[in-house]
Curated annotation (Swiss-Prot):
InterPro entries reported in the protein's UniProt record: AH/BAR_dom_sf, AH_dom, Islet_autoAg_Ica1/Ica1-like, Islet_autoAg_Ica1_C
PANTHER family, alphabetized: ISLET CELL AUTOANTIGEN 1
Bilayer topology annotation: Peripheral membrane protein
Gene giving rise to this polypeptide: Ica1
Disulfide bonds: none
Pfam families: Arfaptin (PF06456), ICA69 (PF04629)
GO-annotated cellular components: cytosol; dendrite; Golgi apparatus; Golgi membrane; Golgi stack; perinuclear region of cytoplasm; secretory granule membrane; synaptic vesicle membrane
GO biological process: neurotransmitter transport; regulation of protein-containing complex assembly; regulation of transport
Predominant localisation class: cytoplasm
Region: Disordered, residue numbers: 276-338, 400-421
Protein's recorded name: Islet cell autoantigen 1
Lineage: Eukaryota, Metazoa, Chordata, Craniata, Vertebrata
Feature: compositional bias, Basic and acidic residues: 276-293, 306-321
């Protein structure tokens, strides 16, 4: 047996059983069951999960590094595009200002030329930022494709070993439920599963250590990469700001004493004719405003004159209204006096005195007074009844029997028949009549006060205290 290792038949049988197809199938079954539990998120053993807490923290850090590096690479690419676009636009603006400055020979042209040169210089200096950014992007991509990818492979192998280890633990848990140490039942099977668990744990611990070390190294290398590349970018950016600010400050100092210009941007293009029309409209509106401001005191004066004119016109209207009303009243009194004279047996000549007296047209201020006097004198015709009866007894009642000429509306003709009043006897009788009337008028006027009460009859018909209690026809007619 020298030179040869001797193994017992029991160890050879056990090794053969471990390599059997049945053992491999059982091992794959419990690994698949563990993967299913992890995928579905079912609750696992608390102690097993707690033993892997530090590993889970390292895995979370690794996934964060992987995600942030991908976002950083995308941001760098987008930032480079924006810088190129901004530099191009700034260069175009500088060229435009320079071209316009060459055409303008004033101070504004010089300022535009200097500003255009400064903008072109700034655009060129801004393009210098692309060099550290391109280097930064290359370093990040290298870090992603090498360091992170290598760590990711190690993490995948570690996860596979952890699944095998936890599956072996589930298998051992299931076998231990059927184990009976007193009867040595299932003892060989338990030992076989226990050996599988130890082997899986050994591989898992080794890969676990590798993953933790690689994640720590990955974090440190990422910090080193960012600090180095960002320092280069920061230096380039500071140089760019320094050169640009120095150039802009020099231009500002050189044109410090120049008068500033007010520039307006066009929101829409307009034709020259439209501009002229708008200018004319603005000028006309300004003129109208000035004229309105100048006419304000004149309008105030004219308002006072208009007020005075309105007051005078209203007074004239009121006077005009009062005159027709008085005329209407006089015509109504004349219309009423006609039937009253007929009832009182008054002569037509005396009844016609009232209308004849009112024929001349006096002034508007004296019309009311004349109408009142006519009303007063018309009542005196009631006292001349005795003289008319005596005249009728001596000379007859021929004149009374003659019908009085009627007008168009049944009223007596206001013109008296004076065709035969030129005989000597009639003239003598007329003189006698005037003398008797002049002697009787003062006495009758003092005794009879009905004329004065009839003056106020329009205001208060019941103002005659002498007529209260009297029922003769004369007072009834007066009250009516």
């Amino acid at each position: 047996m020298s030179g040869h290792k001797c193994y017992s038949w029991e160890l050879q049988d056990r090794f053969a059983q471990d390599k059997s197809v049945v053992n491999k199938m059982q091992q794959k079954y419990w690994e698949t069951k563990q993967a299913f539990i992890k995928a579905t998120g079912k609750k696992e053993d608390e102690h097993v999960v707690a033993s892997d807490a530090d590993l889970d923290a390292k895995l979370e850090l690794f996934h964060s590094i992987q995600r942030t590096c991908l976002d950083l690479s995308k941001a760098i690419v987008l930032y480079q595009k924006r810088i190129c676009f901004l530099s191009q636009e700034e260069n175009e603006l500088g060229k435009f200002l320079r071209s316009q400055g060459f055409q303008d020979k004033t101070r504004a042209g010089k300022m535009m030329q200097a500003t255009g040169k400064a903008l072109c210089f700034s655009s060129q200096q801004r393009l210098a930022l692309r060099n550290p950014l391109c280097r930064f992007h290359q370093e990040v991509e290298t870090f992603r494709h090498r360091a992170i990818s290598d760590t990711w492979l190690t993490v995948n192998r570690m996860e596979q070993c952890r699944t095998e280890y936890r599956g072996a633990l589930l298998w051992m848990k299931d076998v231990s439920q059927e184990l009976d140490p007193d009867l040595y039942k299932q003892m060989e099977k338990f030992r076989k599963v226990q050996t599988q668990v130890r082997l899986a744990k050994k591989n898992f611990d080794k890969l676990k250590m590798d993953v933790c070390q690689k994640v720590d190294l990955l974090g440190a290398s990422r910090c080193n990469l960012l600090s180095h590349m960002l320092a280069t970018y920061q230096t380039t950016l500071l140089h760019f700001w320094e050169k640009t600010s120095h150039t802009m400050a020099a231009i500002h100092e050189s044109f410090k004493g120049y008068q500033p210009y007010e520039f307006t941007t066009l929101k829409s293009l307009q034709d020259p004719m439209k501009k002229l029309v708008e200018k004319e409209k603005k000028k006309s509106s300004r003129r109208e405003n000035r004229e309105a401001v100048a006419q304000e005191p004149r309008q105030l004066i004219s308002l006072e004159e208009e007020n005075q004119h309105k007051e005078s016109s209203t007074c004239q209207k009121e006077e005009g209204k009062s005159v027709p009303s008085s005329v209407d009243k006089s015509s109504a009194d004349d219309a009423c006096s006609g039937p009253i004279d007929e009832l009182l047996d008054v002569k037509p000549e005396e009844a016609c005195l009232g209308p004849m007296a009112g024929t001349p047209e006096p002034e508007s201020g004296d019309k009311d007074d004349l109408l009142l006097l006519n009303e007063i004198f018309s009542t005196s015709s009631l006292d001349e009844g005795e003289f008319s009866r005596e005249w009728a007894a001596v000379f007859g009642d021929d004149r009374l029997k003659e019908p009085a000429p009627m007008g168009a509306q049944g009223e007596p003709d206001p013109k008296p028949q004076i065709g035969s009043a030129f005989l000597p006897s009639q003239l003598l009788d007329q003189n006698m009549k005037d003398l008797q009337a002049s002697l009787q008028e003062p006495a009758k006027a003092a005794s009879d006060l009905t004329a004065w009460f009839s003056l106020f009859a329009d205001l208060d018909p019941l103002s005659n205290p002498d007529a209260i209690g009297k029922t003769d026809k004369e007072h009834e007619l007066l009250n009516a």
